[in-house]
């Protein structure tokens, strides 16, 4: 799957879960589980409750995603 197939949404962090995982409410009111991308882990970018984040999702599973940017 290429990067062109990925869907990007903006959302807000609702809950912090273990292992760098978050419950995120998207702009279209869907709630998903998202984990931190490897580049954000490597650079130790912290994500806190209430942060606006950019989430990347695959069209095959719309319940999970990857946090790629923090606003």
UniProtKB/Swiss-Prot annotation:
Stretches of the chain forming a coiled coil according to its record: none
Lipid metabolism recorded as keyword: no
Cross-referenced Pfam families: eIF-1a (PF01176)
GO CC annotations, alphabetized: cytosol
Ranges of residues in domain S1-like: 1-71
UniProt xrefs under SUPFAM superfamilies: Nucleic acid-binding proteins (SSF50249)
Protein name per UniProt: Translation initiation factor IF-1
Gene that this polypeptide is encoded by: infA
